């Protein structure tokens, strides 16, 4: 079946954030940000007392419900940048008894997906997080989805497999993250990414991070954010 039409989302919803700002380190202390005590305690337990620029720059527009586009390289702290506001919103909305995931995170590689899963779990262990990727038995991932998750993190190919098998339902997704979007293009995931995006409810908040902005990434930004 051809993909359903997807109207362009208003650019006013988007916030473009840099990964650096030269901020005063004292102002970057976690106590200066509108984070819950649960999150602050979890960060401090991990030895995180201050936020990186990308994390601070993403937080305000994200908590306002805006879509976020970030020019960010690997190693800038962007995983915590998108996960903090999403976790805060999920904590505010309370525990979900729904088994369907509320947040989907797309990564170009298994290694990055596993790294992001670890980061999210370390921040708030109570969040139900599942990482899915190819090359391993899909049955275990299907069982975990049936038990219920809040975050599903994975590579586009395996996510498509799970969608086609009816194991992954996206109709409850409230938050979508595309990480290292330019690398999605480099490894040939552009069709899978767009197919997944078209399955997600339009009433969602979207985060896109990319070190560079090739034409496809710009088009995805205009179409889905």
Where are the predicted features?
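The conserved Walker
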Residues: 72-76
């Amino acid at each position: 079946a051809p993909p359903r039409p997807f109207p362009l989302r208003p650019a006013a919803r988007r916030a473009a954030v840099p990964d650096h700002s030269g901020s005063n380190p004292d102002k970057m202390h976690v106590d200066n940000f509108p984070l819950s005590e649960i999150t602050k305690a979890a960060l401090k337990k991990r030895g995180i007392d201050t936020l990186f620029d990308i994390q601070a720059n993403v937080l305000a527009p994200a908590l306002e419900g805006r879509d976020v586009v970030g020019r960010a390289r690997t190693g800038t702290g962007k995983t915590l940048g998108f996960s903090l506001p999403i976790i805060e919103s999920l904590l505010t909305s309370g525990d979900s008894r729904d088994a369907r995931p509320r947040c989907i995170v797309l990564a170009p590689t298994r290694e990055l997906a596993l790294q992001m899963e670890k980061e999210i779990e370390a921040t708030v262990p109570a969040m139900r997080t599942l990482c899915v990727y190819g090359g391993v038995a899909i049955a275990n991932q299907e069982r975990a989805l049936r038990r219920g998750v809040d975050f599903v993190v994975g590579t586009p190919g395996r996510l498509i497999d799970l969608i086609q098998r009816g194991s992954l339902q996206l109709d409850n997704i409230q938050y979508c993250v595309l990480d290292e979007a330019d690398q999605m293009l480099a490894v040939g995931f552009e069709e899978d990414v767009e197919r997944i995006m078209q399955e997600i409810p339009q009433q969602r908040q979207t985060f896109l991070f990319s070190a560079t902005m090739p034409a496809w990434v710009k088009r995805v930004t205009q179409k889905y954010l």
